[in-house]
Amino acid sequence: GFLAENADFASIVQAHGLVFIGPEPEHIRQMGDKVQAKITAAKAGLPLVPGSPGAVDTIEEAQKLAVDIGFPLLVKAASGGGGRGMKVANSAVELSEAFSSARSEAKAAFGDDKVYLERYLDNPRHIEVQVIADSHGNAVHLGERECSVQRRHQKLFEEAPSPAITQTQRKNIGQIAANATLEMGYLGVGTMEFLFQDDEFFFIEMNTRLQVEHPITEAITGIDLVREQICIAAGQSLPFKQENIQFEGHAIECRINAEHPETFAPTPGIVNFFHPSGGAGIRVDTVLYSGYRIPPYYDSLIAKLIVHGRDRQHALARLRLALQEFVIEPIPTTLE
């Protein structure tokens, strides 16, 4: 929810003598500001996309930095998320419009018009690493997730493990993420997001909460991330070490949104008939039922279909069958 990454809320919870199930407020605040997150990430040894050292206040400053960084450039909101406040500039002429547009969009969406610059990678993979740490000096990674299939910079399909990286790359980036988590003194579950292009990883942000796509990590590791974050908040140690974690099979998540399948326009309304998929290796997380009214507010995500197979081909076969079985009527959805 909206409070999961709200540092002020976490602080209020702690001030009232309660335990916030999640990271410390300082880490939520650091990683919520994308500029501060890059500074923290650099100190923790994470590889970064070439870009501005901090927030850029004027177009004149942006033009000067662009000479060193090179085009194409991405102008990004410091407090952004969900693909909002991001504009691509392919030249100095386009930069002026992108800079102004990104700031306006950021101000309207997040109440903060701070932006920064990054080199725009034209064909990257979006790969994220699940990390988890306790208050006893233990931090591990639970492998990576491939999240490259997106629309409007928002994910549609996720899978684990990624078919795009090697075992050596997987081990290296996982260890880098775990070491950075320990270096930061981070507590609880978190996700480090990277862009991967030309065999290089570049850190872009850290989500200080449980991700929508966490079930595919649970499927291939057998670890209940919800349970573990509650146990960590209760002061317990992680019940496993890095060497104990085994990855089994392949998992894919399909986000089912109340959106028109071609235009992605929202489609709120009443669900007259709902039939979720079932069977071996199939999991459905949803609030839907026959008669449920999909509201016109918030996110359009209404269900998550997760499949687990012995390998990628097996998982894809299960996904095809599960999608055929899944019925939501009469609302148009991305199932179609």
Predicted regions and their residues:
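Active-site "cap" helix and flanking loop/linker of ATP-utilizing ligase/carboxylase catalytic domains
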Residues: E159, I165-D199, N207-P261, I331
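A short N-terminal helical cap/helix-turn-helix that marks the beginning
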Residues: I232, L321-E336
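Short, well-ordered beta-strand elements within core beta-sheets of diverse protein domains
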Residues: M86-V88, R119, I165, L301-R310, ...
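Glycine-rich active-site loop/lid that clamps phosphate-bearing ligands
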Residues: E243-Y298
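A short, well-structured catalytic beta-strand-centered motif of the EAL phosphodiesterase domain
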Residues: M206, L210, A303-V307, L319
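Acyl/amide activation-and-transfer machinery of modular secondary-metabolite enzymes
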Residues: R152-E159, P295-K304
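N-terminal beta-alpha lobe that positions the nucleotide/phosphoryl donor
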Residues: G1-M192, F196-Q211
